[in-house]
Structures are given as C-alpha cells and as structure tokens.
C-alpha cells in the first residue's frame, strides 16, 4: 500500500503540473533511499533456494564422502567451554577446547572438522599442528597434526565462534538468543569431527535424478553401535555467563554460581561422560524447590506458565 500511495503521489504531481524543483529533489531523494534500503536488505538476507541447497549437498558429499567416510578420525572425549550470552543484542560468544583421542587401531595423519555456516567461526587452532586448510564453501577444515596420532594418542583443539541473530532470515527455535527465554541446542553448532552424513540428500528420487549412489543408511535402534562410536561419550564442562537477572539451566551439575561485573556466572560439570548432545536455556525464572529422598528437585518456569508445576513436581517424585 505504501508503494501504491507513493506512485499515486508521483502521478498526481505530474498530472496536476506540480512539477517544481522541490518535487524533483524529493523524488530523487526518495529513489536514492529506496535503492539503498533495497541494497541493505539484499546484502543481509541469505537467499539460498532449495535448488542451491541440493547442489551444495551433492557437492559436499562428492568431495568428502569417498575421501573421509570410514577413514579413522579422532574422537572427542572432553569439552571445556566458556559461553557468554548477550540476549539484548541477540548474540552469544563461545570459546572452547576439545580433547581428541585416537580410539582406533590405525594411525591418523589428518582429519576433518566441520563447522556450521550459521555461525561466525573466528578461530580453530592447536599447538600440535603442521597444517590446516580451510574449505570456506563447506565450512570444512582439513587438519594435519605435527606428529601422526598413534592409537590412544591425544590431541587438543581450540576454537572460538560467535552467533548473532539475522533478523532478515527468520527465527531458528533451536538457536534462539532472545531477551527473556533463550534456548540454544549447542551441540548442533559446535565443530564436528569427520564426514557428516546427515548433510547428504536423503530423497531417493532426487539422488536418482543426479545419478548419485544410495545415501548413507541410518542405523536402526537395534543395530550394533559403531566401535569406536565417533563421539562415544564426552566429559562436559562449561562456564556460562548471562545478564545478572537471568538464570541459566544447562547440562551437568551446577558446581558454582557467582556474580561479577553485573553478570551471573554458572559453572556446569557433567562429572561423568554424557552423549554429544548438550544445550542450555536462560531467562528470568520462578523456581519451585523441594527435597525427595535426600535429592534436591528444582523446577524453573515462566511466572505466567505455572499451571502444571505442582503436578510435574509430584510426577518427578514418583
């Protein structure tokens, strides 16, 4: 409607003979502003259609599947990370380190690390590197340790990345950093070791059109686990900071909570190995607490969403 109204105004100016110097200046300024606004939106909008995504998936698979699927890669055994949440700016910052172990019976001379294109990868480094190559098109790093990793050898890998919400590309519910109610499935965005079969095209007819071989099969619930499983289980330690008024709920035992420089810090430690699946939420919560068989139980909830809290507490005790 705004565009129609503007065009009608332009038509009226010309039709009624109100074509003065001031009108010309106004029209020129309006056109310049419209062009600059359009360019800004285009620059910040990720315009990837389905065809582009399918081409990307095919290219990734063709480049990395044969070369790295089934090839010995190190396993993540321990993650230490610091995560700073800035919900008012809709952004968060992560620094972390992986302890990698060669759990195979083969020598590992190089391995690959996949990073996600939604995040801003800032660094990937180690003191034990001879070479690192980045494939920017696929967010892929090819890493060669200074010395080949013999069976049971370990390797430390350090990384930093940042994520900021792009208002032009919609809301991702698994990566939501918002003012009061953040939820981040962190394991979706941390670097991954090895070939990522979940990035393959899964539609059989689409693969047939592209003359691609069968996709990597998904293991059933009763299938034997790959040994060693690519991630097995990990020890997880995280220091998470958030605005002072917010509470962070995360994976592991809350070892310590303290305030510093108008922010609240939460130190989580899994204490024992957990699957490579971890996340957190942060908001201003109400808390309902109780003790049951010497076990502390706490439920964090939005003050206006308390309808089933008592029922939930009773179910937990059972």
Show which residues each predicted segment covers:
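N-terminal, polar/Ser/Thr-rich
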Residues: 1, 15-91, 208-212, 226-230
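Membrane-embedded alpha-helical segments of integral membrane proteins
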Residues: 1-12
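Extended, low-hydrophobicity, Ser/Thr/Pro/Gly-biased non-transmembrane segments
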Residues: 57, 160-277
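Short acidic/proline- and small/hydrophobic-mixed sequence motifs that coincide with surface turns
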Residues: 91-92, 106-108
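Juxtacatalytic substrate-recognition/specificity segment
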Residues: 94, 141, 158, 238, ...
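Asparagine-centered strand-capping/turn motif at beta-strand->loop junctions
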Residues: 99-105, 115
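Aromatic-lined ligand-binding clefts that engage carbohydrates, nucleic acids, or primary amines
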Residues: 110-118
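A surface-exposed beta-strand-loop module
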Residues: 119-180, 224-228, 262
